[in-house]
Amino acid sequence: FSVIFLLFYSLRFFLKQNSALISSIILSSSVFFLQISVNQYADIAVSYFILFSFILLVCSQKNKKLELDLLFLVGLSIGITGWIKNEGLIYSISLISSIIFFQLLNKSFLNKKNYFLIIGFLIAIIPTFIKNIFYTFPNIFLSLNFKEKISFFLNFDRILSVFKSMFTLFFTGNNYIIFFLLFLIYLIGFKKRVNFEILKIFCLFFLFSTSFIFLVFLQMPYDSIEGIINAIYPRWQIQ
């Protein structure tokens, strides 16, 4: 119940009250969301640190007096996301890349205030990389030389298999119905004048994170790609 309560009040930063209420009810009443809340609670934590980062971005735009402090907290929150679990690291890198890319397009990345964002991110993400270097299992892909890595990613059978599995799973089952229904509600209820830049960053984040997930799936054993995607991808979709 606390998750549902936090979800509603978090969405109110971006949506009109009715849209936030309806979307909270739809998401929180889905069987898959309830299963993740109980069995895969780390997924909920990952999702909330990402959501918290977007909320802090909105606050930093509205409160110029605390803008530097809030941007530091944005970077810290994004970096902490990577510590929770492997998916969090993907989201963490995707979101910081989205913010940097957006600011590069606006020619505002060299602004001094962005240093606070980067510093906060580095403080939180460096321990994650140290942990992964010493305490995670070796990755088969990382053990390949440069030529083997190129051949690995140019394996069109593998690329087609991953793309087909992701595309098929995305448009089957109950999850995709919930996803597109929520997306429609968000578009209708989004506070465009207030958070239009945040919407652009989120679109970049969605593109980058999906691309990184695709690259991760490319590293999976070829004979078990479909089974792995079927097991993991729905969690990322609901996140």
Annotated model-derived regions:
Residues 3-14, 47-61, 76, 93-101, ...:
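Transmembrane alpha-helical segments
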Residues 101-102, 113-190, 206-214:
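Membrane-lumen/periplasm interface segments of specific transmembrane helices
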Residues 7-29:
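Transmembrane-helix signature of polytopic, membrane-embedded enzymes
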Residues 31-38, 80-82, 128-132, 206-231:
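Transmembrane-helix signature of polytopic, lipid-linked glycan biosynthesis machinery
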Residues 38-45:
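Short acidic/glycine- and proline-prone juxtamembrane loop motifs at membrane-interface regions
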Residues 21-28, 73, 194-224:
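Transmembrane alpha-helix segments characteristic
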Residues 23, 53, 57, 70-86, ...:
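Membrane-interface alpha helices of multi-pass inner-membrane proteins
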Residues 12-19, 63-69, 104-118, 187-207:
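Membrane-interface helix-loop-helix junctions at transmembrane boundaries of multi-pass membrane enzymes
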